[in-house]
């Protein structure tokens, strides 16, 4: 049990590298994810297609790779599963021992209602700003998973009575992955004497789900991503965005995944559906050569899994705030904060550093800190010519 549960987070780290807001951008990640108005033209396809054209004199650029992973275990589920694995082995060896009965029943009871989350992704982009129509071709992959047990009261009673039987309590992994291949196109228009950038992103999507269900004492990390647990589908989707800039002030609005899509998981004792629905985000930013301050507000909540079993609380509606301080174009210090209006996620502090010698090579790293059991990191490399 201990080895397999801990290894799950490692497995998702590698899975995310080929699986897909659904984006990783180390610069904006460090700024709390507030990229709707503050992202640069290389990452515009991830946040707001209008930003490709906001600075038409920018240089040709390449972003690759950008990669990140986040692990959130607010209820200490991983530790709880490890503890249960240890005491359950002792119980099986001597089910009549009263200490084994008490420790095992308590360990199983403590798993009830706990949940852990894992997410990660990778991406890359090529951007060509022009004075007419600017373009950003990008590929990004992202995956997220929920690990949750379903505990049976009858198992707890059987253990307390010293009955060594097969457990009916389950461990479940629900995972979703998406690969986006898109082309963000944007241009500038004059409206009431103001310059406004307008962008659109047609994109193809490859959608995946995994649904792995097994007895809580028989979880094996080598089995969760077997073909029989997988479903997949393909879809066309679209993002849109607008951005207004007056001196250092920016206001922007982005709509992502305007075409709703649902994909069902494999059927086990339950069946779930993952929902890809539109997300609208309003962003503002104050951008100068030495500092950037940004704020993003999701205008609607985002629901993910629904199903026939107990409700999975994974809907979010985020407020993000961030800042970047630039040392004359050579190094950057960043920080931010994320708050979930739906209270699904705990508040997240983000930090990051950037190095950009001669403003040609850009290397960015970020870290997110939620609590002692929840954290994340991302990194990226970019070239501007």
Kindly give the residue locations of the regions a language model identified:
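Gram-negative bacterial Sec-dependent N-terminal signal peptides
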Residues: 1-19
